[in-house]
Amino acid sequence: MKLTCMMIVAVLFLTAWTFVTADDSGNGMEILFPKAGHEMENLEVSNRVKPCRKEGQLCDPIFQNCCRGWNCVLFCV
């Protein structure tokens, strides 16, 4: 019984801790992972827009690198 109560308290504590420490800002990952040194030195390169894939081209489902309006399912469709 004591072990069960301790487990419940631990789970509640960890859940509360997760919500308290969560970063709710829109650019949280940008703050956690600052730009690489070479991007900071050459701002023109870092601000360049990366090319997108057009309809029918191979794409990366993880990064969703298709142009706007297209969905990535191995190919931009």
UniProtKB/Swiss-Prot annotation:
The keyword Membrane is assigned to this record: no
InterPro entries assigned: Conotoxin, Conotoxin_d-typ_CS
Any one GO molecular-function label of the UniProt entry: sodium channel inhibitor activity
Alphabetized PROSITE patterns for the sequence: DELTA_CONOTOXIN
Record's keyword terms, sorted: Disulfide bond, Ion channel impairing toxin, Knottin, Neurotoxin, Secreted, Signal, Toxin, Voltage-gated sodium channel impairing toxin
More info: Negative results: does not show effect on hNav1.7/SCN9A.
Description of its domains: The presence of a 'disulfide through disulfide knot' structurally defines this protein as a knottin.
Protein name: Delta-conotoxin GmVIA
